């Protein structure tokens, strides 16, 4: 199957009351693991690519060609979107789209509201003309992820969310409602009352960033309140690192990179399968 935009898969998730996982990729093995999990689970999947990860892998075009090649060689039949995570500017989003990304996030949340609307509208106009879906953000998600640093959580304002959606025509919205990038200190406290209000005011799929470490019952409640996309990265990083460390501790003389990285790839696949089942997306690509 060819790459698709996120729009239809997220609208279907919203109607079906489940969420599609965005799992960030960092190299070939991460991409293999996530695609293999999606195919095995018959789940739609979103491959998230941060600007930092794209630079690490060689650039937007390299990433797109790698994903397309793997999808062909692995006989992937489920819907796959390749999504720019936290695009920092119109120019970065345009470069990703021109390289073949099927979805982009423009993160202008650190700008004043009117500037956020202006930049987001510019991205939507360019993206939609090319069949590419757009995610935007309001408020501040705490923690740190690659080039994105949010010192503390600032909740999104529901009325601003409604206005942003109406004025820009975005396909999904990531309102900051208590989640953070990276590990949580203590138990997460998501703003479910605000989430429900934003769902009712906007009517579009909502996105939960910082999905690692949020208890299953909170994940399920978020999905019931319109969250249709959940981002996971830290959990895969931890699983990968744990597997590689265990291998090296067991056999410090190993030097074949495939033997070192392989267990990490397997750990990511197992983690992603668990998340797909938790989010309710398993089996949805077969319907």
Swiss-Prot record:
Gene name as annotated: fba
GO molecular function, one term: zinc ion binding
Chain residues that bind D-glyceraldehyde 3-phosphate: 50
Residues involved in Zn(2+) 2 binding: 107, 137
Pfam families noted in UniProt: F_bP_aldolase
Lineage, top ranks: Bacteria, Bacillati, Bacillota, Bacilli, Bacillales
Positions annotated as active site in the UniProt record: 85 (proton donor)
GO BP terms: fructose 1,6-bisphosphate metabolic process; glycolytic process
Name of this protein: Fructose-bisphosphate aldolase
């Amino acid at each position: 199957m060819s790459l698709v935009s996120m729009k239809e898969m997220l609208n279907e998730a919203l109607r079906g009351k489940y969420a599609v996982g965005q799992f960030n990729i960092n190299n070939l093995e991460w991409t293999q693991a996530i695609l293999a999990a999606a195919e095995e689970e018959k789940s739609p999947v979103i491959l998230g690519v941060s600007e930092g990860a794209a630079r690490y892998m060689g650039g937007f075009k390299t990433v797109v060609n790698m994903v397309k090649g793997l999808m062909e060689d692995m006989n992937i039949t489920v819907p796959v979107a390749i999504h720019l995570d936290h695009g920092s500017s119109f120019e970065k989003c345009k470069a990703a789209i021109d390289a073949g990304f099927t979805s982009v996030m423009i993160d202008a949340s650190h700008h004043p509201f009117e500037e956020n609307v202006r930049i987001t509208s510019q991205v939507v106009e360019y993206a939609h003309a090319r069949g590419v879906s757009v995610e935007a953000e309001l408020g501040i998600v705490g923690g740190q992820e690659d080039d994105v640093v949010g010192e503390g959580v600032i909740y999104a304002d529901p009325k601003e969310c409604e206005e942003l959606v109406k004025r820009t025509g975005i396909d999904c919205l990531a309102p900051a409602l208590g989640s953070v990038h990276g590990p949580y200190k203590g138990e997460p406290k998501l703003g479910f009352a605000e989430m429900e209000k934003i769902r009712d005011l906007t009517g579009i799929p909502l996105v939960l960033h910082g999905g690692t470490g949020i208890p299953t019952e909170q994940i399920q409640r978020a999905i019931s309140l319109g969250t249709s996309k959940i981002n996971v990265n830290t959990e895969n990083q931890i699983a990968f690192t744990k597997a590689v460390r265990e291998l090296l501790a067991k056999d410090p003389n190993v030097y074949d990179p495939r033997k070192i990285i392989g267990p990490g790839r397997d750990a990511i696949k197992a983690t992603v399968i668990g998340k797909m089942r938790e989010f309710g997306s398993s089996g949805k690509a077969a319907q």
